[in-house]
Each structure stands twice: as structure tokens, then as C-alpha cells.
Amino acid sequence: MKNLTILFKVTTLSLAVALLVGCNDDDDNDTAPPAQRSNQTVNILAFNDFHGNLEPPKRYVEAPNPNDAAQSVRIPVGGVSYFADAIKKLKAENPNNAVVSAGDLISASPLTSSLFLDEPTIEVMNDIQIDFDAVGNHEFDRGTDELRRLKNGGCQQYTSTVPCQINKNFSGAKFDFLAANVAMKNDTSKTIFPAYKVKTYGGI
């Protein structure tokens, strides 16, 4: 995966769902109502390769100076505070949304997160209220048992680092972990996490 966090919005113009009406032998039901349609606009807010970057990295982007178009200014980028604010603003534009991490949310992370087994990143993402994390390769850096602990919570130690150093009641991720292509070694018919989840919008 590219070492770049990307935040983008995909707008689905129309989600149409047909209401299927069952049939039986009762003559009173011969005139069933026609299939109904309902349109919903859904924003998918997706990002990837966050890697526990809670603090802004020492990087800048050049942007036009609002006071002088001929000049530019250096603006610090990244960090979870900016990220959370961006998500909040995008959510406010449309309540029908899904916030999706497309992999490498954790691990290969800076000390502020990795020192605590990336528990701070999980808890911050809980506060931001992301919906799904499609686990990437780096989620498995510390093994499947530790990855499940981050999802389900608890303080069982699976690595050389002691867990729950900050929060003695670490409860795990409140969002779904997804993994369609990672099967269990002892039962290849089962994936380590669900392959998909369904989210409803406006009753659809």
C-alpha cells in the first residue's frame, strides 16, 4: 500500500431498492401494490494507510496565500485532529454516509501509538465513529490473536509489549473489521473477520 493517507468522497447518485411483494393463493391479494423505489444519496468517506499517525508529521504543503495570490504559504498537514475535523464537516453535509478505512489503519506507526500497541488509534477512531476497517497487511504485523484483541477488547498479552498501559479497561474497536480474503488456517471456509457488512440508509 502507498504510504499516503487519502480522504475522498464518492457520491452514489441513486440507490434503488425494489420492495418485493410475496404472493399466495388468496384472491384478496391479487392486486398487490407495484414495486416501490426510494432514492438516497450516500457519501462514502474512505481513507487508507493511516498507520497510527495521531500527531501531525513534519511535512508541509504549499498553498496560495489568501492575502496575496502571487505568494504561497506552507501549511502543516496530517494528524488526527485535522482528520477528525474533516470527517465531521463531510458528515454534516449528508447524514447518509459510511466512513471506511481501506487498510493499514494501525501498525508501522509512530511511537505515540505503537508504544501502546495502537490502542490509542483504535480509541480515537471510535470517537470519530468510523464504520468499517478493511484490514490490510500491516494489521497482521503482531499476529491474529493481537489483532482480534484490538477488535474485541481486553488486556490479554500476545506480544512482548504489555497491553492496556493507558486504559485498563480497553474495550476494543466499536467499528467493524472486514476481511474477505483472509481465511482461518484450521477452517478455510471461515474468514478471520466478516467479508462484508450491510448498512441501511433511510430505511433502505
Curated annotation (Swiss-Prot):
It holds the Pfam family Metallophos. GO terms for cellular component: outer membrane-bounded periplasmic space. One of its GO terms (biological process) is nucleotide catabolic process. SUPFAM superfamilies: Metallo-dependent phosphatases. InterPro entries: 5_nucleotidase/apyrase, Calcineurin-like_PHP_ApaH, Metallo-depent_PP-like. Gene3D superfamilies: 3.60.21.10. It comes from the Bacteria. GO terms for molecular function: 5'-nucleotidase activity; UDP-sugar diphosphatase activity. PANTHER family: 5'-NUCLEOTIDASE, 5'-NUCLEOTIDASE-RELATED. This is Uncharacterized protein in pqq-V 5'region. It comes from Acinetobacter calcoaceticus.
